[in-house]
């Protein structure tokens, strides 16, 4: 079934933004297809998609991903009147501290990560726990293209065309017990292939961890992504499996997931543990609640530059208020930031 989320979630195929432009949180941490060939295009992709992905660098997609592309629901969810971020920006300006603190480190060091074979553990308060090879984990689900805004806590933003499937589909399949209230996610811990994990980042207790309330995780906008820009995820963008929660700040969208646990109590998360006064558990995009060191009322839409800063007003819930505000009825969003 094609998800139709009108009102605030619509966009044109020619209008997507590159994910390569992020401000650094080194202040906290440091203190302690150059043209896709026609044959490589996914099945059913027409002239609009060819033009849209003209700058995408071809990857080396695993067979399971290539097989699933033919049945992809293109533009299942879009945004309105906003440009898609250039692929090079989206893949060469990233926060992924497992590969280093600088924005270029993930692209420079990401090739060291081996994403095949890959497995995911699902455990905790579920009736059907298990360890799954990635190709088996994704097999039941049809890929959808979700064109989402991405808003970083550092006050920059982009628009990204993801390929993935609703997280809710996975959760329903593993059958949460009545005790399940939260979902906890964990990134791979592999210092041999993730140099940032063996460097001077003593402040981070690896592996990286994130969490959602169960009702947030079940919302149809929350997805597990395996691709972007019509191809598989590059390593620096969270290959081979990442979370995307578009109404929350980007650090909630955990990358390179190896474990999904359903739990009864609110899980500890990495950034909240490092600086709870700066990074809350909810991390909903909220222009009325500032970061202690900068305003969240406005954002730089990337790409931007000295003479074209491209600054705009930040929208509540990153523009998805119509869809998600009801999740937080009665919750003090200033206290629960």
From Swiss-Prot:
Cofactors demanded by this protein: Mo-molybdopterin
Molecular function (Gene Ontology), one example: oxidoreductase activity, acting on a sulfur group of donors, quinone or similar compound as acceptor
Family according to the record: Belongs to the MsrP family.
Cofactor binding, note field: Binds 1 Mo-molybdopterin (Mo-MPT) cofactor per subunit.
Keywords: Metal-binding, Molybdenum, Oxidoreductase, Periplasm, Signal
InterPro entries (UniProt xref): MsrP (IPR022867), OxRdtase_Mopterin-bd_dom (IPR000572), OxRdtase_Mopterin-bd_sf (IPR036374), TAT_signal (IPR006311)
Catalytic activity: L-methionyl-[protein] + a quinone + H2O = L-methionyl-(S)-S-oxide-[protein] + a quinol; L-methionyl-[protein] + a quinone + H2O = L-methionyl-(R)-S-oxide-[protein] + a quinol
Matches recorded under NCBIfam families: PRK05363.1 (NF003767)
EC number: 1.8.5.-
Biological process, per Gene Ontology: protein repair
Primary location group: periplasm
The protein's assembly and partners: Heterodimer of a catalytic subunit (MsrP) and a heme-binding subunit (MsrQ).
Protein name: Protein-methionine-sulfoxide reductase catalytic subunit MsrP
Pfam families, per database record: Oxidored_molyb
GO cellular component: periplasmic space
Entry PTM: Predicted to be exported by the Tat system. The position of the signal peptide cleavage has not been experimentally proven.
PROSITE patterns in alphabetical order: TAT (PS51318)
Presence of keyword Oxidoreductase: yes
Task of the protein: Part of the MsrPQ system that repairs oxidized periplasmic proteins containing methionine sulfoxide residues (Met-O), using respiratory chain electrons. Thus protects these proteins from oxidative-stress damage caused by reactive species of oxygen and chlorine generated by the host defense mechanisms. MsrPQ is essential for the maintenance of envelope integrity under bleach stress, rescuing a wide series of structurally unrelated periplasmic proteins from methionine oxidation.
Positions of Mo-molybdopterin binding: 94, 97-98, 152, 187, 237, 242, 253-255
Highest taxon, organism lineage: Bacteria
């Amino acid at each position: 079934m094609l998800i139709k989320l009108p009102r605030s979630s619509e966009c044109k195929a020619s209008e997507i933004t590159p994910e390569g432009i992020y401000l650094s949180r080194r202040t906290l941490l440091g203190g302690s297809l150059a043209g896709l060939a026609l044959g490589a295009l996914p099945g059913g992709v027409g002239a609009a998609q060819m033009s849209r992905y003209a700058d995408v660098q071809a990857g080396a997609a695993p067979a399971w991903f290539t097989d699933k592309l033919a049945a992809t629901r293109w533009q299942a969810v879009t945004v309105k009147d906003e440009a898609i971020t250039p692929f090079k920006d989206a893949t060469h300006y990233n926060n992924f501290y497992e590969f280093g603190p600088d924005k270029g480190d993930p692209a420079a060091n990401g090739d060291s990560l081996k994403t095949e074979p890959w497995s995911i553990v699902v455990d905790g308060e579920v009736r059907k726990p298990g360890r799954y090879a990635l190709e088996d984990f994704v097999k039941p689900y049809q890929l959808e293209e979700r064109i989402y805004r991405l808003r970083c806590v550092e006050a920059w933003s982009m628009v990204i065309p993801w390929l993935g499937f609703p997280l809710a589909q996975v959760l329903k399949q593993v059958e949460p017990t009545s005790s399940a209230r939260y979902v906890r996610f964990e990134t791979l811990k592999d210092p041999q292939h993730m140099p940032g994990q063996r460097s001077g980042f003593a402040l981070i207790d690896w592996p990286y961890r994130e969490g959602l309330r169960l009702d947030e995780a079940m919302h149809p906008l929350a997805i597990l992504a395996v691709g972007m820009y019509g191809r598989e995820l590059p390593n620096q963008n969270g290959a081979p499996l990442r979370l995307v929660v578009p109404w929350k700040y980007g650090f909630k969208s955990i990358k390179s997931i190896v474990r999904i646990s359903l739990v009864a109590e609110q899980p500890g998360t990495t950034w909240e543990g490092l600086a709870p006064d700066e990074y809350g558990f909810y991390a909903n995009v909220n222009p009325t609640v500032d970061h202690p060191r900068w305003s969240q009322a406005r954002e730089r839409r990337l790409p931007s530059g000295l003479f074209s800063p491209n600054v705009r007003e930040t929208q509540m819930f990153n523009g998805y208020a119509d869809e998600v505000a009801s999740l937080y009825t009665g919750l003090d969003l200033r206290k629960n930031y």
